[in-house]
Structure formats: C-alpha cells, structure tokens
Amino acid sequence: MVSACLAGLHCRYDGRTNHKPEVAELVASGLAVPVCPEELGGLPTPRDPSERRGDSVVSNAGRDVTAEFAAGAEAALYIAEEYGCSAAILKARSPSCGCGRIYDGTFSRTLIEGNGLFADLLLKKGFEVFTEETWPGLSPEERASAPYPGGLSASSSSSDISPHTEPTCGR
C-alpha cells in the first residue's frame, strides 16, 4: 500500500502531488495499491492544511477534522486488508500518513515525534510502515532485472516492499 500522492495522484491538501517515480512504479506494476485516507474520509481536494494536536486533527482554519481523518484511516485499512498488504510506504510528516515525525499542530512547521492517524492504525494492526524518506527501495539486483530503468520485474513480489517482519516505522 502507498500514499496516493506519492504515486502521482493529485490528492494532496493543495491539489498537487508528491510524485515519487519509484513508488508510482510499484503501483503501475501491480505491487502496491494507492490510497488517500483523507479523501476516503470525505475531505475534498483541495482542502485546508491539517495537523495533529494530540489525539485530534485540526485544520489551519480551526475546524476539527478528526472524524474525517479517522473514517479515512479505517477505510484505507479495510482496503489494505482486502488486498493482503503487509507494508506501506506513506507520506512523511502527514497528519494521516506520517510515521515517526509529524507537525506539532501549531502550523509553524515544527516537527515532533509521532504518527499520523492512518500510520498509527497500520502499526497497531502489525503492518510495517515506511515513509518515502525511510523506504529502502529496490535492491541493485531488482533494478538490474527490471524490464525498464528503475522498474520492477515480473519476478518481484509484494515482499520486496518490506524486508523486515516486525511492525515499525522504517528508519
């Protein structure tokens, strides 16, 4: 499973994308499914930026959007389980997908230790969670056997996404 914005979908809060070609290739090859928990929770794109404040998620306009974020996390978890996913590559620092470090809820770009709601849920369910900054990527051997530069070969499997077994934020 991957954050849809990393796969090139325009679902970021500002309607843009956080496209990472290597993540998009996982989706294109059928090795990962893209999700945007915030859209799945009913939030529009574009939308106000939001940050976690303790157990809540609030927009920069002061609106409590915790219910939408929680509903989206549950919907994305359902998709992950239906597809048999065991690992995820999620958007760093996001109030949904951040893993290990997120913004502190003051909209000052200050980072604190913590996870987004969706990342938290995946970790509690035993998934391994990476961000685009911590995912180790494909090995040189996998790259060499790929049918196109930087791509995946037909012999690749979903286990290529997760080289570890314990549920942690990849570092």
Question: Residues of each region from the PLM?
Answer:
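Short, hydrophobic/glycine-enriched beta-strand segments
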Residues: M1-A4
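Short, active-site-adjacent cap segments at secondary-structure transitions
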Residues: G8, G42-L43, P95-G98, G137
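Short N-terminal binding/cap micro-motifs at the start of the first secondary-structure element
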Residues: G8-G15
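Short, surface-exposed acidic-centric catalytic microdomains
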Residues: N18-S59
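Divalent-metal-activated hydrolytic enzyme cores
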Residues: L40, S50-I79, T110-R171
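Active-site charged/polar residues at nucleotide-handling catalytic sites that mediate phosphoryl
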Residues: Y83
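Short acidic/polar active-site loop segments enriched in Thr and Asp
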Residues: S86
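Internal, conserved structured core segments that host functional sites
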Residues: K91-F107
